[in-house]
């Protein structure tokens, strides 16, 4: 009975995000306890209480891109679009055309790339974010970027990740 409910809830999430969660179904089939632990990751990511929506989605997009998971990036595109994020901004984030972004969004993208993609630091970007959005938003953006990079790792480890074709993702974002 619990598995049936779990699969129904996963199906609802798939509809909301616009991608399939094959690996989450596999977790549900394997262990309800493991599914509960996995779901805690989403509760860690989903509440965006302090960061501006666009900055939050820039952080999540760049985090997912760093993990090279096509369906994960597609999910982040869909979530960003659902909040009304401008498709031109999404495209600039996908193509790394940061010079066209507002300064604080460019700083968010640079920090996400440094932290999740290069495993380095970008103190200037961090200070720009802190001065523009505040300390709480900075922390939340760090949760967003690293969380969006973490989930594809679970998916890849289970054998469900697909490589990310940025050109295809740009077409999806514009559709």
Model-derived regions: residue spans:
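Acidic/His metal-coordination segments adjacent to aromatic residues that form catalytic metal sites
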Residues: 94-103
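Conserved alpha-helical segments that form or flank metal/cofactor-binding pockets of metalloenzymes
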Residues: 56-87
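Alpha-helical scaffold segments that form or flank carboxylate-/histidine-based iron centers
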Residues: 20-26, 53-67, 139-142
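Acidic, carboxylate-rich catalytic segments that either coordinate divalent cations
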Residues: 146, 154-175
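Helix N-cap / loop-to-helix initiation motif
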Residues: 51-52, 84-88, 122, 134-135
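Mobile cap/lid helix-loop segments that border enzyme active or cofactor-binding sites
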Residues: 1-53, 81, 173-175
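Acidic/histidine-rich alpha-helical segments that form the ligand environment
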Residues: 104-143
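Short alpha-helical scaffolding segments that buttress acidic/His motifs in well-ordered protein cores
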Residues: 38, 42, 58-63, 93-94, ...
């Amino acid at each position: 009975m619990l598995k049936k409910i779990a699969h129904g809830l996963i199906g609802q999430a798939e509809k909301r995000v616009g991608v399939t969660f094959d690996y989450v179904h596999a977790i549900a089939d394997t262990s309800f306890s493991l599914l509960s632990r996995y779901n805690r990751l989403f509760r860690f990511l989903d509440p965006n209480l302090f960061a501006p929506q666009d900055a939050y989605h820039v952080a999540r997009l760049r985090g997912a891109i760093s993990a090279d998971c096509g369906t994960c990036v597609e999910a982040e595109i869909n979530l960003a679009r659902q909040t009304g994020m401008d498709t031109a901004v999404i495209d600039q984030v996908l193509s790394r055309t940061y010079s066209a972004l507002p300064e604080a969004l460019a700083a968010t993208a640079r920090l996400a790339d440094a932290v999740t993609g290069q495993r380095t630091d970008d103190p200037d970007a961090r200070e720009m974010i802190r001065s523009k959005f505040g300390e709480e938003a900075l922390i939340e953006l760090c949760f967003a970027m690293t969380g969006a990079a973490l989930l594809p790792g679970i998916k890849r480890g289970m054998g469900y990740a697909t490589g990310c074709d940025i050109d295809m993702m740009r077409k999806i974002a514009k559709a």
